[in-house]
From Swiss-Prot:
Sequence repeats: 30-31, 33-34, 36-37, 38-39, 40-41, 42-43, 44-45, 46-47, 48-49, 50-51, 52-53, 54-55, 56-57, 58-59, 60-61, 62-63, 64-65, 66-67, 68-69, 70-71, 72-73, 74-75, 76-77, 78-79
Organism, scientific name: Drosophila erecta (Fruit fly)
Compositional bias (Gly residues): 30-63, 84-96
Subunit composition and interactions: Forms a heterodimer with timeless (TIM); the complex then translocates into the nucleus.
Name of the protein: Period circadian protein
Name of the gene: per
GO cellular component, one term: perinuclear region of cytoplasm
Keyword Repeat: yes
Length: 110
């Protein structure tokens, strides 16, 4: 704000009498000015980086046990005859093999 005026004092004399008189001026304070207004803008940038590492380890073991069992059995029979001698029986299959051979008496007597 503006400053007030300064006061002054003084003495003066008159022609007929010597008279001291004090005059005081009272200063009046000035009023303050208004504050200014302001605006502001700001920008900001930022970057961030990060790295991460990880390790996964694991072991696994397993055992599988199994038994497969089976029985195959069968009977193959066959007959064979021949004028020149008995033929072989039919071949046996897996498992038990039974061979039959049938010959006639006429062949046995020759």
């Amino acid at each position: 704000g503006g400053s007030g005026g300064s006061g002054s004092s003084g003495n003066f004399t008159t022609a007929s009498n010597i008279h001291m008189s004090s005059v005081t001026n009272t200063s009046i304070a000035g009023t303050g000015g208004t504050g200014g207004t302001g605006t502001g803008t700001g920008t900001g940038t930022g970057t961030g980086t990060g790295t991460g590492t990880g390790t996964d380890t694991g072991t696994g073991t397993g055992t599988r046990n199994g038994t497969n069992s089976g029985t195959n059995s069968g009977t193959r029979t066959g007959t064979a005859s021949s004028y020149r001698g008995g033929g072989g029986g039919a071949g046996g299959g897996g498992g038990v093999t039974i061979q039959h051979l049938t010959l006639t008496e006429s062949l046995l007597n020759k």
